[in-house]
Structures are given as structure tokens and as C-alpha cells.
């Protein structure tokens, strides 16, 4: 498990979330991140529950199955549930865990613009930025607020990048309604 991370000097993206359920938007940003940043792999780190959101509607085992199914053709995307391994659901602990596996990993933590707005409230967010570069994907209705957020103003410009998207405005909550 995670042997793909043991190669020297590889670039990985980490997209964390509940994936309730995984959808086309997750795939699109993963593909764009891979292409723009030349990532070797992207880990979809599935969490049991997001501390900033309501309880997931779909059980974690089912969310993992759905994620594996929709990423079948995208072999660079690795579906992982690591909370039990690292004994934590915090992003900082996940990043530290990955760095322990391979200190040469170049990690890019991927988030939507909506998450950047509250990023300064995340546990040890400044340390996350030291250990991983941040890729922020535009989300309709969040651009201005995210670019003016506390975290956006405090992060050094070399540690994060804002990526504009052509319209792919679909969220997990919209997917559940379909």
C-alpha cells in the first residue's frame, strides 16, 4: 500500500474530502491539476466526515467504491482512506504522514475556492502551507471572497496558485439531487 509514493522526487496532488458522492467536478479538477502541475499522482483522500459540513449521506465504504469506479480510467488517481492509519482526520496529520513515507515528495494540496475562505480556521493551516503547496480551484460565486480571504492574504505567493475553471459547477450536493 502506498508503494507508488516511494519513488524519489515525485509530485503528488492531494484532494481531501468526503466525496459524498464523488462526481465529474472532482475528476475535472484532478485532470487539470495533473496537466498544469505535471503531477505523477493525485490521492483522493476520503474522510469519514468534514468538520465544517453536515454528516455525509452515503457510507464511507460506498463512497470509496463509487470513487474507484469513476476513476477507473484515470490511473494516476489513487483512492485512499487513511484516517485509520494516521489515527486522525486532520489535513496536517495526513501531509506529515505522506512526508514520512517519502521526504522528497513534492505535495500539492488541492481545494476549492470555497475552502480557501475558511482555510485560516483549519488546524495548523500555516504548517500545511509550509509542507505542501496549495492549489485553489475557482468555484462559481466564491472567487472574490476566496482571493480576499485571510489565508490568501497571508500565504506567500510561491506557496499557492489560483486556477480558473471553465464552467464545471457541480457539487456533491447537486449530484445527490440528480
Predicted regions and their residues:
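Nucleotidyltransferase catalytic core that binds NTPs
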Residues: 1-178
Amino acid at each position: 500500500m502506498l508503494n507508488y509514493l516511494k519513488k524519489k522526487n515525485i509530485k503528488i496532488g492531494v484532494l481531501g474530502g468526503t466525496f459524498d458522492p464523488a462526481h465529474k467536478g472532482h475528476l475535472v479538477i484532478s485532470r487539470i491539476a495533473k496537466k498544469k502541475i505535471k503531477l505523477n499522482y493525485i490521492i483522493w483522500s476520503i474522510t469519514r466526515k468534514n468538520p465544517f459540513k453536515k454528516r455525509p449521506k452515503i457510507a464511507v465504504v460506498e463512497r470509496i467504491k463509487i470513487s474507484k469506479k469513476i476513476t477507473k480510467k484515470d490511473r494516476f488517481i489513487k483512492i485512499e482512506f487513511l484516517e485509520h492509519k494516521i489515527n486522525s482526520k486532520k489535513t496536517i496529520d495526513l501531509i506529515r504522514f505522506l512526508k514520512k513515507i517519502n521526504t522528497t515528495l513534492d505535495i500539492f494540496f488541492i481545494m476549492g475556492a470555497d475552502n480557501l475562505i475558511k482555510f485560516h480556521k483549519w488546524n495548523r493551516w500555516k504548517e500545511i502551507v509550509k509542507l505542501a503547496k496549495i492549489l485553489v480551484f475557482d468555484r462559481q460565486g466564491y472567487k472574490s471572497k476566496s482571493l480576499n480571504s485571510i489565508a490568501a492574504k497571508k500565504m506567500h505567493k510561491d506557496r499557492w496558485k489560483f486556477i480558473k475553471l471553465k464552467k464545471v459547477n457541480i457539487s456533491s450536493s447537486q449530484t445527490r439531487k440528480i
